[in-house]
Amino acid sequence: MLKPAPTTRIDPTLARGTLLARSPATNDRPPSVTLAFPNTHYEMTLTAVGDVKADVGKRIIGIIRAEAQRVDLVKTGGRFVEPVYGMPRRVQGSIIAADNTANTITLHAGMPVVCKLTDPRQRAVAFEPGQLVCCEIAPGATFTQKAPARDEA
């Protein structure tokens, strides 16, 4: 059963979800978290940046960051992340923010994903909010927990 999304307004670049699992670092793998998102069946596994203090099964707010290998404008399709379970490899969504200094765009793909443009031929200034784009994601997408303000929980 899908749980309804919270309705409290927060920074649109922040992802709001539920912590499903926490995995410690190993010799060949950094620490990771698995998150679920309201109104979706996504279970996204991301590299944890910093200390993730939420309890498993509880709500969590933070920033999902990924490196976009190339960003293409698309005219059809919707918002999605592939695969539904695991580490993201492909993201399609509408642009909700662009940071020309950091060369990032934030996509609404069921949850916000901040994508750093890594193709040297592409700059964030070339993209506009509202455009529908699709990109391949380099391995190693991350999640950084943000402590919510009292009205963001």
Language-model region placement:
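Structural preference for solvent-exposed beta-strand-turn elements
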Residues: 2-19, 109-111, 117-128, 137-138, ...
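Structural detector for short beta-strands of small beta-barrel domains
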Residues: 2-27, 82-103, 134-135
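Acidic (E/D-rich), amphipathic helical modules within compact regulatory domains
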Residues: 23, 28-79, 84-85
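A structural detector for beta-sheet-dominated domains
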Residues: 36-38, 65, 96, 108, ...
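Short, solvent-exposed interaction modules
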Residues: 70-127, 131
